[in-house]
Every structure is written in C-alpha cells, then in structure tokens.
C-alpha cells in the first residue's frame, strides 16, 4: 500500500531491468532538465546528478536499490530525493524537494523541450538600459550576480530590489518556463523605476553555497542588493523598495526593520505566521488537493506536527536531533501497525525524515515568527496574496 508523507517520503513498487546508464528527464514544476548517471565501480553502485540549466554537473548523491527493482536517489544537502522503479527503458517515480512532490519519468534519451509561446516575455529592443552586474555581500564575503535595468538618461530614479522565494532561483525566478521577475523588471523599468534582480547565492552566476544557507543568510544577500542600489549614481537612495515573493516577502519584512532609510516593502504571497503554523496548514491543503484523506492523512499530519512541535520546543538543532529519532521510531511503528508501510521500509523512512528535518534552513524557518519584525516596520508596506494560493493560505 502506498503512503504519501507530504514532508517526508514516498514508496513505490514495481518490476524492471538494469538501472545502469544515463537517464534524462525534465521537472515540470521548474522546467528544469535533470540527468542521472548511474554506474557500478569496484562493486559499488554510484550515481551523480546533472542540472544543466543551473550549470551544475556531477553532483554527488546516494543511491539505494531494493526489492522489486525499486530505486532511491538522495541528495541530502539540498533535501532532494527521487524514489521509484526502474524498467528496461525508463525510471518512473516521485521527485521530492521539501514539500514539493512531482511524478516524473526518466528516459534513456534526452527529452526535447516543447516550444511554448510566452507572449508576456519582454522583447528587445528595450526602452531602458540593462546591465549585467555583480555586488558583494561583505558580511559573508561572496559576490552575487544580477541584472540592473533603469530608464535612459535619468537621475534620482526610484529603485526596487526583487527577492525570490524559497528554493534555488535564478534572477528571473524562472519556473515552468515562466519568468515572473524578468516580466516585473521590464514592466517597472518601463514605468520609470530602476530594478535589480539577482541569482540566489550558489545558483547560476552567484557565488556561495545555497544548500547550507538559512533565511538569515538570504536576508544578508538582499540587504547587500539594497546597499548596491544606494551606491548607484542613477538611483535616489531615499526611494528604494524591496519586493519579495514567498520567502522573499518574509525577507522584505526583516529588511523593513534592518535598513532604516528603506522607502517601502512589498510582500507577494509572503508569510505572516510562524513557520510551523504555515506548514501545518500548507501540507494538509496540499494533501487534500491530490486526494489524500482518511487515516493516512491524519496519521501523517500527526507525525509532521510532532516533529514541528519538537523543533519549537528544542534549544538547538542538536537537541532536536535526539527527539527526532524517538518521534520517528514511534510514528513509523504506527504506520506499520496500520499496514500503510512494509517493515522493510522502516529504516529508510527514518533516515529520510532525518535528512529532511535536520536542515539548518528548515530548522530556522519552522521557528521563525514574522510577528517579531512586522510590528517594528516603519516604512510603507504593500501586501498582496492570491485567494487560491494553498502554499501560503
């Protein structure tokens, strides 16, 4: 029987052939090509992962085979996993990153991308200036890369920094072929604003390590973007606004108290309640949206809640690690008793929970409450959220 842990793991069953070779797919949620290189060396199974669009190649990963031609690939540092079944011509299963789940199939040949018309994408020639820029996060000693657009032949220009949401994002916040930050930058610069958008640290042309970073680190990156705009001769340093999407909205709130002369902040689908509260709502809504219900859903929700409560009540991530082990064992036994999982899966599930939860970014996010900063914001504030948004409902 199959169970979906919306924060943890999926298990699939099937039959198949040899898994060795190069396997290609494209993640629909991010329009992101992905390649697995699976081989056997000195009697050991080895896998490396390419994300060509992100210019990331030969990333190390862990591979596990089990009965029924099941396969699992894990990249623990960035919370990514694939679990499924290998066949003679494909690998089919579930890709997971954080709470995001996607059914995908890998094939032996690269998948030709479908050409989709995007009439909303900006088209040259542009009516504004455009520069590829780099600016320094002095506190963390790293260079961030971005694009700076601004009206031609003007000075004292009001400016906007665009801050992306959670997960590694390029400067356009590109997903499924959509480039919302590019479109926003084009629209705003045509209206007379200077706009800076940048690649997340450790992503595309920005330096740093994304996998080990927390929201606090991303706040420092966004603050560095503001300081860079303040140094530009075209910009009116007293008229700078931070526009953040999702986690970027949370970051904007913090900057609203950290940078005293900030003109304003804009939160697009940002959060206003503590991380564990968001996740309790988010994971249930996501589960219901894909048809999960009944005892499986309730037990999964109870498991998640116990983990998040332990994070809140712990003094540090090391103390939480001790609690996590006992909580996981307790609930895995309950899943086994209800026959939602097989006994042979217990150890792997516990390990997957550990990899998902003992993550500095996740630990900080669960504990952080925007109520710490929101009452202290003194600049202008605009908050926008979609009525059908189940991620930050």
Label each PLM-derived region with a short phrase.
Residues 234-246:
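Alpha/beta-hydrolase fold nucleophile elbow
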Residues 18-86, 90, 94-97, 181:
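Central antiparallel beta-sheet cores of small beta-barrel/beta-sandwich binding domains
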């Amino acid at each position: 029987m199959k169970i979906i842990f919306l924060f943890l793991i999926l298990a699939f069953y099937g039959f198949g052939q040899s898994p060795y070779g190069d396997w290609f797919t494209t993640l629909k949620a991010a329009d992101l090509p992905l390649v697995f290189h699976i081989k056997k060396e000195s009697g050991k199974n080895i896998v490396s992962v390419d994300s060509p669009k992100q210019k990331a190649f030969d990333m190390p990963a862990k591979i596990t085979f089990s009965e029924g031609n099941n396969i699992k690939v894990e990249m623990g540092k960035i919370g990514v996993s694939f679990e499924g079944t290998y066949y003679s011509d494909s690998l089919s299963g579930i890709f997971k990153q954080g709470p995001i789940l996607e059914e995908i199939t890998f094939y032996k040949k690269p998948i030709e991308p479908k050409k989709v018309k995007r009439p909303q994408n900006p088209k040259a020639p542009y009516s504004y200036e455009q520069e590829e820029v780099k600016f320094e996060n002095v506190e963390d000693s790293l260079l961030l890369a971005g694009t700076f657009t601004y009206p031609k032949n003007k000075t004292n220009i009001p400016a906007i920094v665009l801050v992306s949401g959670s997960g590694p994002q390029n400067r356009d916040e590109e997903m499924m072929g959509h480039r919302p930050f590019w479109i926003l930058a084009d629209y705003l610069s045509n209206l007379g604003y200077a706009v800076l958008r940048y690649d997340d640290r450790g992503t595309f042309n920005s330096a740093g390590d994304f996998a080990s970073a927390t929201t606090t680190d991303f706040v420092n990156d966004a603050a560095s973007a503001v300081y860079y705009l303040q140094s530009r001769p075209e910009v009116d340093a007293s008229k700078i606004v931070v526009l953040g999407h999702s986690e970027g909205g949370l970051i904007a709130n913090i900057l609203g108290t950290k940078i005293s002369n900030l003109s304003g902040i804009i939160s697009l689908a940002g959060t206003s309640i503590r991380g564990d509260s968001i996740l309790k709502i988010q994971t249930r809504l996501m589960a219901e949206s894909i048809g999960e219900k009944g005892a499986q859903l309730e037990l999964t929700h109870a498991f998640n809640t116990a983990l998040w409560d332990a994070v809140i009540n712990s003094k540090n991530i090391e103390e939480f690690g001790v609690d996590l082990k006992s909580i996981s064992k307790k609930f895995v036994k309950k899943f086994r008793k209800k026959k939602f999982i097989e006994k042979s899966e217990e150890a792997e599930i516990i390990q997957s929970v550990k990899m998902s939860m003992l993550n500095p970014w996740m630990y900080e996010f669960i504990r952080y409450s925007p109520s710490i900063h929101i009452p202290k914001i003194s600049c202008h504030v605009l908050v926008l959220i979609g009525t059908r948004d189940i991620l930050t409902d």
